[in-house]
UniProtKB/Swiss-Prot annotation:
Keywords: Cytoplasm, Glycolysis, NAD, Nucleotide-binding, Oxidoreductase. It comes from Streptococcus dysgalactiae subsp. equisimilis. One of its GO terms (cellular component) is cytoplasm. GO terms for biological process: glucose metabolic process; glycolytic process. Its EC number is 1.2.1.12. Belongs to the glyceraldehyde-3-phosphate dehydrogenase family. NAD(+) binds at residues 12-13, 34, 78, 121, 316. The keyword Chloroplast does not apply. It comes from the Bacteria. Pfam families: Gp_dh_C (PF02800), Gp_dh_N (PF00044). It is found in: Cytoplasm. This is Glyceraldehyde-3-phosphate dehydrogenase. Binds human plasminogen.
Length: 336
C-alpha cells in the first residue's frame, strides 16, 4: 500500500523532504502547494548549492512537474483550506510553510478535501506531540491528527541529552548551538522586520548571537529535563552544518571513556557516533539527526564535583529533514 503525501511549502525543508521521500518505499508525493512559480520550484529542486544536484530528472509540465517520470501536481493556494488534497489521494500533509505551526492552524487541511494527518516541520505548541528520533515514536498511538518534528537544534540536542541523562542523570546544563546562517538572516546589513538588530546584520560575514527554541522544547520532548537546561545560539558564516555543545553537572562523577561508551551504546539511525576528527563540511548531507563527536568530550574537576562537556554535529538542513521523513514514514504506518 502506497501512502500519498502532500507538501505545503516547497522551501528548503519541503524540497529536501521531497528528495528523501524518493527513496522511501511505500510513500509517494502527489501534490505540492507553494506560491512560487513552478519553473522556479523545479529549478530549485534540481539544483542546490549546499546539498548538490538532485539525483533524478525534473521536467516542468502543465499544472506541475514530472520527476523521474511521475507527474506531481503543483498548486498555489494561499489558504490550506482551499487545497483539493483529495483529488490526488493525499492522506498526510507535510506542513512546511512555517506559517501554520500551531495545531489549530495546521489542522486546516484536515477539514478540507480529505487529508487525514499533518506533520509540522517546526516546533508545535504544547498540545502537539513532538518527536526527535525513532526512539520517541512510541509516544504515538495512531489516533493523532497533527504531530511535530520539533526543530533541527532540538533534534541534535535531545538524543545527546537523553543518552547522558539516562546513563548518569543531568542536574543542570547550558547548551550552545553554533548554527549555520539561514534564509531569515540578511545577506548584507539592512532593515529587517521584528526589530531584531543582530539579525539585521550580514549573516555570511558575522557571528550573530541569537536565541534558540531548543532551550524550551527540550522539556516538551524529554519531560524529565524540563527546567534543567538553558541555552543560546551563535549563527556563524557557513551555509549549512552546525554543532551543539552541552555543558552539564551530573548526579555522579564520570570519566571521558564512560561518557563516550554510553553515547556509543545509545547510537542508532537517528543518533550517530564518531571518533573521527571531522569539521562542519564533513556532515553536510548526513542523515543522522545528531552525530555525537567523541573527540570533543571533556570532564573538568571542580571542588569534588565535575563539569562535563559533550558535543554533537548536525546538518541543520538534511539532518532535520531525514528525521522528518522517518517520522512521516512511521506516522503513515500507524495511522488509524
Amino acid at each position: 500500500m502506497v501512502v500519498k503525501v502532500g507538501i505545503n511549502g516547497f522551501g528548503r525543508i519541503g524540497r529536501l523532504a521531497f528528495r528523501r521521500i524518493q527513496n522511501v518505499e511505500g510513500v509517494e508525493v502527489t501534490r505540492i502547494n507553494d506560491l512560487t512559480d513552478p519553473n522556479m520550484l523545479a529549478h530549485l529542486l534540481k539544483y542546490d548549492t549546499t546539498q548538490g544536484r538532485f539525483d533524478g530528472t525534473v521536467e516542468v509540465k502543465e499544472g506541475g512537474f514530472e520527476v523521474n517520470g511521475n507527474f506531481i501536481k503543483v498548486s498555489a493556494e494561499r489558504d490550506p483550506e482551499n487545497i483539493d488534497w483529495a483529488t490526488d489521494g493525499v492522506e498526510i500533509v507535510l506542513e512546511a510553510t512555517g506559517f501554520f505551526a500551531k495545531k489549530e492552524a495546521a489542522e486546516k487541511p484536515l477539514h478540507a478535501n480529505g487529508a487525514k494527518k499533518v506533520v509540522i516541520t517546526a516546533p508545535g505548541g504544547n498540545d502537539v506531540k513532538q518527536l526527535f528520533s525513532t526512539l520517541t515514536t512510541s509516544i504515538l498511538d495512531g489516533t493523532e491528527t497533527v504531530i511535530s518534528g520539533a526543530s533541527c537544534t532540538t533534534n541534535c540536542l535531545a538524543p545527546m541529552a537523553k543518552a547522558l541523562h539516562d546513563a548518569f542523570g543531568i542536574q543542570k546544563g547550558l547548551m550552545t548551538t553554533i548554527h549555520a546562517y539561514t534564509g531569515d538572516q540578511m545577506i548584507v546589513d539592512g532593515h529587517r522586520g521584528g526589530g531584531d538588530l543582530r539579525r539585521a546584520r550580514a549573516g555570511a560575514a558575522n557571528i550573530v548571537p541569537n536565541s534558540t527554541g531548543a532551550r524550551k522544547a527540550i522539556g516538551l520532548v524529554i519531560p524529565e529535563l524540563n527546567g534543567k537546561l538553558d541555552g543560546a545560539a551563535q549563527r556563524v558564516p557557513v551555509p549549512t552544518g552546525s554543532v551543539t555543545e552541552l555543558v552539564v553537572t551530573l548526579d555522579k562523577n564520570v570519566s571521558v571513556d564512560e561518557i563516550n561508551a554510553a553515547m556509543k551504546a545509545a547510537s542508532n539511525d537517528s543518533f550517530g557516533y564518531t571518533e573521527d576528527p571531522i569539521v562542519s563540511s564533513d556532515i553536510v548531507g548526513v542523515s543522522y539527526g545528531s552525530l555525537f563527536d567523541a573527540t570533543q568530550t571533556k570532564v573538568m574537576e571542580v571542588d569534588g564535583s565535575q563539569l562535563v562537556k559533550v558535543v554533537s554535529w548536525y546538518d541543520n538542513e538534511m539532518s532535520y529533514t531525514a528525521q522528518l521523513v522517518r517520522t512521516l514514514e512511521y506516522f503513515a504506518k500507524i495511522a488509524k
